[in-house]
A protein has these predicted regions:
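Phosphate/diphosphate ligand-binding glycine-rich loop within oxidoreductases
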Residues: 31, 50-127
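N-terminal glycine-/charge-rich "phosphate-binding" loop or analogous flexible N-terminal tail
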Residues: 1-49, 157-159, 255
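Phosphate-binding beta-alpha-beta segment of Rossmann-like dinucleotide-binding domains, i.e.
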Residues: 90-153, 160, 168, 297-304
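C-terminal helix-to-coil terminal segments
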Residues: 2, 7, 13-18, 25, ...
Length: 305
């Protein structure tokens, strides 16, 4: 039984050591494909793999078609839009993610981004505090819950909207549940985005929604760039000199947005899960899920049908 770890952006050594211990301890073989630059290297490596672990690497229909023995693929992280779920299902491959393993890392980054932007990117003599501000959490999953926990430490008033999370589950955490996404944006000084990129959410964060936000508003995006209507973001920043946007996913129109100076910031690459702890947690979770699936048929975190 061969487990392939294919990562253009490799795991930390400690994560690989842990993955190896889990995989080989279960009696399986571990193979590594790291820092590959040609997708053909991926095709060749996956050809005889029974299980696959990736990070942000794209598991396309073509990858799946080259993987003649593949039974399971695990995306080490919460988002799984880099997996072609239809292709996996067609080839009877179980696709999983590892929810919750990087949620604290993303939450800490989101909170840090709020401070950075409220201090006008650390411009001396200016800025404001988070204490007393209204924070809206758009999607109350593992990351959203951690953002709420951190924000309450700053003394923020926390609101949340999640169409799939019961009101009671939100409010038991001391967070105010609102009835619609429009209400969330109309109410809050800051909105922290945690929605996945799906056909329903792509470009759903548009001008009409953003323009509901109060004066001096900030949008923090540690989710996916695809959920932002990028042309509308330019329009919003142009029409509302009080509005700010920060993201850890550089948009396609980044150069257009830099004209807005300290009201816009994007990290040079996706940073939410870029901590040693998150890297290790997600890698070990992926390895454990593969072993549990192969040995016991456990499909708890399956994301395809």
């Amino acid at each position: 039984m061969k487990v392939l770890v294919a990562t253009e952006k490799p795991f930390a050594k400690a994560a690989i050591d842990g993955i190896r211990s889990i995989v080989e301890g279960a009696g399986f073989e571990l193979a590594l494909l790291e820092k590959y630059t040609d997708v053909n290297e991926f095709y060749k490596a996956v050809a005889d793999a029974d299980a696959l672990i990736v990070r942000s690497d794209k598991v396309t229909k073509e990858v799946v078609e080259h993987a003649k023995n593949l039974k399971i693929v695990v995306r080490a992280g919460a988002g799984f839009d880099n997996l072609d779920l239809a292709a996996c299902t067609e080839h009877k491959i179980v696709a999983m993610n590892t929810p919750g393993q990087n949620s604290n890392a993303v939450a800490e980054l989101a909170a840090s981004m709020m401070v950075f932007m409220f201090r006008n990117q650390f411009t001396p003599g200016t800025g404001a505090e988070l204490k007393g501000k209204k924070l809206g959490i758009h999607a109350y999953g593992n990351v959203g819950r951690n953002v709420a926990r951190v924000a309450k430490g700053f003394g923020m008033e926390v609101y949340a909207f999640d169409a799939f999370c019961p009101k009671e589950a939100i409010e038991k955490d001391g967070v105010k549940a609102v009835g619609s996404v429009e209400e969330l944006y109309s109410t809050c000084n800051v909105v922290s985005l945690h929605i996945p990129a799906t056909k329903e959410t792509i470009e759903s964060i548009n001008y009409d929604l953003l323009n509901r936000m109060p004066k001096g508003a900030l949008l923090v995006n540690t989710a996916r760039k695809e959920v932002i209507h990028e042309a509308d973001m330019v329009r919003m920043l142009n029409d509302r000199p009080d509005f700010k946007y920060i993201t850890d996913i550089r948009p396609a129109n980044h150069d257009d947005l830099t004209q807005f100076g300290t009201r816009y910031f994007a990290t040079p690459k996706k940073m939410g899960a870029e901590t040693a702890e998150a890297n290790i947690n997600a890698g070990l979770a992926a390895a454990n899920q593969i072993v549990d699936f192969i040995k016991n048929g456990v499909t708890k975190f399956q994301v395809n049908k």
